[in-house]
Amino acid sequence: MLPSACPECQGKANLGFVGIAANPKEYHYHSVAEDRLVLITPNREPYQTLHRQGTSGLDLLDRPMILREENSGTRQEMERYLRKQQIDPDSMNVIAQIDNPEAIRSSVSRGLGVSIMSVLAAREYLLSGQLLSFELGDQGAYRKIYLTWRKDAQLSAAEQKFLAFVKDRHPVTAPE
């Protein structure tokens, strides 16, 4: 069974992908990818000018912000990164917390606010020109994507083969 990030999966799936290694006592986490967090805005003025000028996303944190819910991996990584930059996440002007990335992308593209999300999650809107992305500082903010499974799980033969396939292609894992 998977962590609470997927309540509808409880009892139905033994393997899953998550954005934070939240419970290493009960779950194995195997790192499979890294994803960059960026600040996204609608593709309109004044953001177009700021984008051309190379403005950092950190300079736009005072804008009305639409964020993921507090227990999301993206939100936790964003807050961790901001604290590391000496920025209090509670100082942001959060106007909405939404648990649906599509609703966040759509809201931002319509000009209702800005957000911080992963490049992978914003990719389609960025490629179609509906959104702009701003880097979060010189070194950027990153999160890992993990394959996860319970330590006490009895994996089927197919699940074990899939796990071996992933581990073969991504040999680095999260600390236990």
Name these PLM-found stretches:
Residues 44-56, 152-157:
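Short helix-loop capping/hinge motifs at secondary-structure junctions, enriched
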Residues 132-175:
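A late-sequence structural motif
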Residues 28-31, 56-58, 84-86, 123, ...:
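Short secondary-structure boundary/capping segments
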Residues 1-4, 9-12, 87-132:
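Hydrophobic hinge/microswitch elements
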Residues 48, 64-86, 156, 173:
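Secondary-structure junction motif
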Residues 2-42, 49-51, 109, 132-134:
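Short beta-strand-centered segments that line the small-molecule binding cleft or hinge
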